[in-house]
Swiss-Prot record:
Catalytic activity, reaction form: cytidine(1402) in 16S rRNA + S-adenosyl-L-methionine = N(4)-methylcytidine(1402) in 16S rRNA + S-adenosyl-L-homocysteine + H(+)
InterPro entries associated with the record: RsmH, SAM-dep_MeTrfase_MraW_recog, SAM-dependent_MTases_sf
Residues bound to S-adenosyl-L-methionine: 47-49, 66, 93, 108, 115
Source organism of this protein record: Synechococcus sp. (strain WH7803)
Sample GO molecular function, one term: rRNA (cytosine-N4-)-methyltransferase activity
Main localisation: cytoplasm
Annotated Gene Ontology cellular component terms: cytoplasm
Protein name, UniProt field: Ribosomal RNA small subunit methyltransferase H
GO biological process, one term: rRNA base methylation
Length: 305
């Protein structure tokens, strides 16, 4: 494994989480099952995980999927040393089927650092930008701003509670709808985050986690149908694998992890490799705070499936 990843576009720098954890776990698996053949990186992003796999395992070929054009451009740069072994496809993994059986399917479900750190994408409550949150900014899908205007207060509260696990969801939804009625659409993510934070008691606004975190998560999940898309992946991906092939999924919050855990337990095509999720080391958590909530689960396709 190289000490440094290949250089990539300066607008899309992303440190892949659980990289060493993933590679170490894969190294423990019989090489006959997966260290040659096709890898499908269902969430290519900037190509961080893919570059490590391609460098470490020279017999792998890779198909990378991503609906974000900025991510695809960055990945093409980062993966250029292995371009003869790489194909990048502009698609959401829910709409995809590989041309042949894969030996490994990988999905990193987190929002990448560049998406969070570019104000214009509208994912961040720390940087002011349009209240957008679409993974594919070129799509004609509904933005977060449009969603909160369209929804009734009670439905918005239910959404924030269900997808953000936010205990103050009704108070937050009431404030959002009151603001929209009084002043029209929010100017951007900063004013929206300020309004959400104002629903918290003063002491609760000074914690390590920003008070708007759960509400932003809920809206992002809804705008991109993230849980529906994940359910589709969990249903489809075992069918993409050859017998003995591996399915590795990195999740970042309990709604995702519960779905992955349940699917790995209940899908008769799969055997769990990780009984408990693998997590970042203390060193990685210190180096990359976004790894603190990451959980990796791996399953193997049964030979008789």
């Amino acid at each position: 494994m190289p000490d440094q990843l290949p250089a990539t576009d300066s607008t899309f720098r992303h440190v892949p989480v659980l990289a060493d954890v993933l590679l170490n776990a894969l190294d423990e698996e019989p090489s006959v099952h997966w260290q040659s053949g096709l890898v499908v990186d269902a969430t290519l992003g900037g190509g961080g995980h893919s570059s490590l796999l391609l460098d470490r395992y020279p017999d792998l070929r890779l198909i990378g999927l991503d609906q974000d054009p900025t991510a695809r451009a960055a990945a093409a740069t980062r993966l250029s040393p292995w371009k003869e072994r790489v194909s990048i496809v502009a698609t959401n993994f829910a709409d995809y089927s590989p041309p042949q059986s894969a030996s490994l399917v990988l999905a990193d479900l987190g929002v990448s650092s560049p998406q969070l750190d570019v104000a214009a994408r509208g994912f961040s409550f720390r940087l002011d930008g349009p209240l957008d949150m679409r993974m594919n900014p070129e799509s004609d899908g509904e933005t977060a701003g449009e969603l909160i205007e369209r929804m009734e207060e009670s439905d918005l509260a239910d959404l924030i509670y269900a997808y953000g696990e936010e205990r103050l969801s009704r108070r937050i939804a009431r404030r959002i709808k009151a603001d929209l009625a009084a002043q029209g659409p929010y100017a951007g993510t900063a004013s929206f985050a300020y309004a959400v934070a104002g629903c918290y008691p003063p002491k609760a606004r000074r914690g390590r986690i920003h008070p708007a975190t759960r509400t932003f998560q809920a809206l992002r999940i809804a705008v991109n149908d993230e849980l529906g898309v994940l359910d589709q992946l969990l249903s489809s991906a075992p069918g993409w694998l050859q017998p003995g092939g591996l399915l590795a999924i990195i999740s970042f919050h309990s709604l995702e992890d519960r779905r992955v855990k349940t699917a790995f337990l209940q899908d008769e095509r799969l055997d769990r490799i990780t009984r408990r999720p693998l997590v970042a080391s203390a060193e990685e958590q210190e180096r990359n705070p976004r790894s603190r909530s990451a959980k990796l689960r791996i399953a193997r396709k049964r030979s008789e499936s």
